[in-house]
């Protein structure tokens, strides 16, 4: 039998007396399939992953050949991706860890070895999403906010802390340490792994998936990774692949360098604008060209972070000498850096600007010298505004038609004022365009010492000139790691930021994800009473309407330097390039140019205070550096003691009644239609993340468990409780089910009695009768966020199959991984064209002979006995997915496989 690609590609190299195994990309070139130098670097990383992990079942020669022929006409197919590690944040991480704990309990219930239930690849959870800015502009803000954070989240934190003791290969970075993507960049990422595989030291690229869309930040250091939904992350943890189509790769050729006055933030916002115009949704983006060498690694990370905003799967910068320089700066060892360079050179993945450019699907060019100081807003990150145009842009937006770039108000808005009477007796007046929130926030920018120290220098010059921030501006500084605090301190700049109210409020996402906390009551009242259009300026990555604060209607993304400058001005209705920010101590006007540092000032400051020693010191004890976390009372027992009275964390019912052997693929008979929907049903329609209504099934459940309405919290915060989440499935207040005409929200008709009732109530009645359910849908079913509960909830309601005209990629995959059969109408056919109104009994003639993308016969029996028959495509996209389905889902398959070992 001929050797497969894995065997052909296995090679060795020696470094410092040690031999390393690796899998050489040239193996595909030697077979005459492709020239490796023609492949984009991101595709090379994927190809290495396939070569090294080929097993002739999940990953085959065919996958390797298909990916190797990247860029060739008509080359389609899917790539199985098995990342080398997984990162989680606490919002999305809780349900993933709940599933692991539930797997353990299920293993114990059937007498299996519970130690077999552990992540198979390293998992790091960073707790960063829960801190809110309650206290600010004072020296005690950090401690006060952290205390409140622990009080609000104690049960969740107790659970996550227990998991660190219970599971191998799982670590949690405590609250008040940093933001997941910055901790990943500065500490967790190895760029190249060395692991013992079959007794050999094997080198291979660091790759990952993360349960947060901005996981792409790590692409800045040449590590391939992106955000996924929870089920896909769990699959990765348990050694299972995720699948995606062979991507197009758009090359962005960078030339020249940034001019004086322009920052990495300005460049990232410009890239977002250009790539949104280009259209890169679902594609890889890779940066190359002579301009790359003029970008420090921190600038690259800022650009890569915003890949979700420009719509790409990733924004990749291949590893080069600048990457190695950053590794040294952040305290990685010289020995490891030498290994990274040697391995990547040996395996044709080290970027050199002098080498021939790869072949990209398409190329666009960006001249860095044309970037200028900018903001984005008022409602979308891709809506770029040059600083010079900001005043006119804001004024135009006030009266522009309501939409992404307008508020639909009239000119009288500019005459509005709100008088504020502070509790200390002082007074202030807020006008249209005044700034309610100015936040230095988000890993997008706080990972970048150039813009952070730049902001500190702006603050220093402003304080020395005698400028102050108006009392109505809520100011905050929330860096993504403690290293930032260290270098601002060592540069002597933090006191100047403190003088302006930019005191440290926490280490976490804060304002960037909407955890901006309340404004002062007197300010909130004044804004609400006058219905005043106020603004925020933040160094974040998203500014959708209502995201930052419910009362703040216009939100602008900007560099930390501009956040400080606008806070001083107190309004966005100003031309900062030509109008004074304020008056100095001497009574003279002070302009932006008077407080803006030069490129040399910033660079000299960075060089003097950002050192390897600082990174080594701050990350030395990263998993145990928070006393409140260390004091959490948890047992070290390997099984989690689920509290039946908890409304946040419950043992999900996925494994109840699990048989020892998997099922077989059998016909589905007598199904009733629970939902009939049109096009573009999103995962948010299927599983909302927001507020829980008091009269909904989920609201009634919480009230039955003595939870006051004011403490309902959101569906998102209760993702660890399947009882809440299943009641919230198809419960979005805006979903329209054609089976309950005249209603909006989660209602259906229960056919045995023709009653209209909540979908959850009907589903439970069908379950009592032993009746399976079906959902009929149009195009793009499951589009939007990769929300795992959209598939989990569908499963728990008893839905056996969804028949849609087309699916969004991740939701289709999630349905299979939850044991729900995705069927697709033939092109040109739909429920309506076939005359299906939802009253029918549905049967699907499927059995073990089916193969991926086969057509099966579906029969719909009308109430009068007439039959409608049609063919539907089985949307299993691989043989592995058929196994998931036989087992009832990926978690059930993992459990049975572990039992069989």
Curated annotation (Swiss-Prot):
Name of protein: Aconitate hydratase A
InterPro entries according to UniProt: AcnA_IRP_Swivel (IPR044137), Acnase/IPM_dHydase_lsu_aba_1/3 (IPR015931), Acoase/IPM_deHydtase_lsu_aba (IPR001030), Aconitase/3IPM_dehydase_swvl (IPR015928), Aconitase/IRP2 (IPR006249), Aconitase_4Fe-4S_BS (IPR018136), Aconitase_4Fe-4S_dom (IPR036008), AconitaseA/IPMdHydase_ssu_swvl (IPR000573)
GO biological process: propionate metabolic process, methylcitrate cycle; tricarboxylic acid cycle
Source species: Staphylococcus aureus (strain Mu50 / ATCC 700699)
Any coiled-coil regions, as ranges: none
GO terms, molecular function: 2-methylisocitrate dehydratase activity; 4 iron, 4 sulfur cluster binding; aconitate hydratase activity; metal ion binding; mRNA 3'-UTR binding; mRNA binding
One Pfam family from the record: Aconitase_C
Function: Involved in the catabolism of short chain fatty acids (SCFA) via the tricarboxylic acid (TCA)(acetyl degradation route) and probably the 2-methylcitrate cycle I (propionate degradation route). Catalyzes the reversible isomerization of citrate to isocitrate via cis-aconitate. Could catalyze the hydration of 2-methyl-cis-aconitate to yield (2R,3S)-2-methylisocitrate. The apo form of AcnA functions as a RNA-binding regulatory protein.
């Amino acid at each position: 039998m001929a050797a497969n690609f894995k065997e052909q590609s296995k090679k060795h190299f020696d470094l410092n007396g040690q031999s390393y195994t690796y899998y050489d990309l040239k193996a595909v070139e030697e077979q005459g399939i492709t020239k490796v130098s023609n492949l984009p670097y991101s595709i090379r990383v994927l190809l290495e992953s396939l070569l090294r992990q080929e097993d002739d079942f999940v990953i085959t020669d065919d996958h390797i050949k298909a990916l190797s022929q990247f860029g060739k006409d008509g080359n389609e197919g899917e790539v199985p991706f098995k990342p080398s590690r997984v990162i989680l944040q606490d919002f999305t991480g809780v349900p993933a860890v709940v599933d692991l704990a539930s797997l353990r309990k299920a293993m114990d219930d059937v007498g299996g070895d519970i130690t077999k239930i552990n992540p198979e690849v390293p998992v790091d959870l960073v707790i960063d999403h829960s801190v809110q800015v309650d206290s600010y502009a004072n020296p005690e803000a950090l401690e006060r906010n952290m205390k409140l954070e622990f009080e609000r989240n104690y049960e969740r934190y107790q659970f996550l802390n227990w998991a660190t003791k219970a599971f191998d290969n799982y670590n949690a970075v405590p609250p008040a340490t940093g933001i997941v993507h910055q901790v990943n960049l500065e500490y967790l990422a190895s760029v190249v792994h060395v692991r013992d595989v079959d007794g050999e030291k094997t080198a291979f690229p660091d790759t990952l998936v993360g349960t947060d869309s901005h996981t792409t930040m790590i692409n800045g250091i040449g590590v391939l990774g992106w955000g996924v939904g929870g089920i896909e992350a769990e699959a990765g943890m348990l050694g299972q692949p995720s699948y995606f189509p062979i991507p197009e790769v758009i090359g962005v050729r960078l030339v020249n360098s940034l001019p004086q006055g322009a920052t990495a933030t300005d460049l990232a916002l410009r890239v977002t604008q250009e790539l949104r115009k280009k259209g890169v949704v679902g594609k890889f983006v890779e940066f190359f060209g002579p301009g790359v060498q003029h970008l420090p690694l921190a600038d690259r990370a800022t650009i890569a972070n915003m890949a979700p905003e420009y719509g790409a799967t990733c924004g990749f910068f291949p590893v080069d000498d600048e990457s190695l320089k950053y590794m040294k700066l952040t305290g990685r060892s010289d020995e490891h850096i030498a290994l990274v360079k040697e391995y990547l050179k040996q395996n044709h993945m080290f970027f050199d600007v002098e080498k021939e450019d790869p072949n990209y699907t398409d190329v666009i060019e960006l001249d860095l010298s044309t970037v200028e100081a900018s903001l984005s807003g008022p409602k979308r990150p891709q809506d770029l505004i040059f600083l010079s145009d900001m005043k006119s842009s804001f004024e135009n937006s006030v009266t522009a038609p309501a939409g992404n770039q307008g508020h639909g108000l009239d000119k009288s808005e500019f005459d509005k004022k709100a008088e504020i009477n502070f509790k200390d007796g002082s007074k202030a007046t807020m006008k249209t365009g005044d700034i309610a929130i100015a936040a230095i926030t988000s890993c997008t920018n706080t990972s970048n010492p150039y813009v952070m120290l730049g902001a500190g220098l702006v603050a220093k010059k402003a304080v020395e000139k005698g400028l102050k921030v108006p009392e109505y501006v809520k100011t905050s500084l929330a860096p993504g790691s403690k290293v930032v605090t260290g270098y601002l301190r060592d540069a002597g700049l933090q006191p100047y930021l403190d003088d302006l109210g930019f005191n440290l409020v926490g280490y976490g996402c804060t304002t960037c994800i909407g955890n901006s906390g309340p404004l002062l009551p007197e300010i909130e009242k004044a804004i609400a009473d006058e219905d005043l259009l106020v603004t925020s300026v933040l160094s974040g990555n998203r500014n959708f309407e209502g995201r930052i604060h419910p009362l703040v209607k216009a939100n602008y993304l900007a560099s930390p330097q501009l956040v400080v400058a606008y806070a001083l001005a107190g309004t966005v209705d100003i031309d900062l390039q030509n109008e004074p920010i304020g008056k100095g101590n001497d009574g003279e006007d002070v302009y932006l140019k008077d407080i803006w540092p030069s490129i040399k000032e910033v660079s000299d400051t960075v060089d003097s205070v950002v050192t390897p020693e600082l990174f080594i010191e701050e990350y030395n004890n990263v998993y145990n550096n928070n006393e409140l976390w260390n004091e959490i009372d948890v047992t070290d027992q390997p099984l989690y003691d689920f509290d039946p009275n908890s409304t946040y964390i419950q043992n999900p019912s996925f494994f109840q009644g699990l048989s020892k052997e998997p099922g077989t693929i059998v016909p589905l008979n007598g199904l009733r239609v629970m939902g009939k929907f049109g096009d573009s049903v999103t995962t948010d329609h299927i599983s909302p993340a927001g507020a829980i209504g008091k009269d909904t099934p989920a609201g009634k459940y919480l009230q039955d468990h003595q939870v006051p309405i004011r403490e309902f919290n959101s569906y998102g915060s209760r993702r660890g409780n399947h009882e809440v989440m299943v009641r919230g499935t198809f419960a979005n207040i805006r979903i329209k089910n054609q089976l309950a005409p005249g209603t909006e929200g989660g209602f259906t008709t229960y056919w045995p009695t023709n009653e209209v009732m909540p979908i959850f109530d009907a589903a439970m009645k069908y379950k009592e009768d032993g009746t399976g359910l079906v959902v009929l849908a149009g195009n793009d079913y499951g589009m939007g966020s990769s929300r795992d509960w959209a598939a989990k909830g569908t499963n728990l309601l008893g839905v056996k199959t969804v028949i849609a005209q087309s699916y969004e990629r991740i939701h289709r995959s999630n349905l299979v991984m939850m044991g729900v059969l995705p069927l697709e109408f033939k092109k040109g056919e739909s429920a309506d064209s076939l005359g299906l109104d939802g009253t029918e009994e549905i049967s699907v003639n499927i059995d073990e002979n089916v193969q991926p993308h086969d057509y099966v016969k579906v029969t719909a029996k009308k109430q009068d006995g007439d039959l409608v028959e049609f063919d539907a495509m089985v949307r299993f996209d691989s043989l592995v997915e058929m196994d998931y389905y036989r087992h009832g889902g990926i978690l059930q398959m993992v459990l049975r496989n572990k039992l069989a070992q």
